[in-house]
Amino acid sequence: MARFFQSAVKNTIIFSTALFSAFTFAQSKLAIVIDDIGYHPKEDAEVLAMPKEISVAIIPAAPYAKIRNQQAKAQNHDILIHMPMQPVSNIKIEEGGLTLGLSEAQVNERVKKAKSIVPNAIGMNNHMGSAATADATLMTYLMTALREQHLFFLDSRTIGKSVAGKIAKEQGVRVLDRHIFLDDSDNLADVQRQFQSAIQYARK
């Protein structure tokens, strides 16, 4: 989401505020999560100035992760840990992320460390993770750790064959799926169309 906000965040703030007003009236529910918080002070500040109904997902390895956790909490935003996870591609992920082959103890330790950096988090979603969320062993270890930390999991659905939701339910972890990416395109009109698609989905 950060790429889009660099060019269009002011317009998005107005648009999203109007959407939330409409949704309150219609008694429908739309959850919006803005990812990649913790790297860019200006963009982060613009996101945190948005209505409190918008959730923020903080990357624990980001340089401003701790202060963004405090600021988001002070402004009554729900907070998620945006946990880096191994993708199918060879893109390198941030330090402390989840990769294939980690032991259960290693996964547990990384989740605990992430929670210590973002202590006000109520859940976790995946940053990338197309390989990680399709791996049953890694997801089993992750859901065990999330259950111990009393965190839910939001599957960003970066791959169609994700097993995260299935394993979360088996492990007794609350799980949600991402349905629509708002910023597949950086064009404001495209993002607005995605918002409208999100509204229609929520009203089903």
Language model segments and positions:
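Hydrophobic helical h-region of N-terminal Sec-dependent signal peptides
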Residues: 10-19
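Basic/polar, cationic surfaces and motifs that engage anionic cell-wall
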Residues: 1
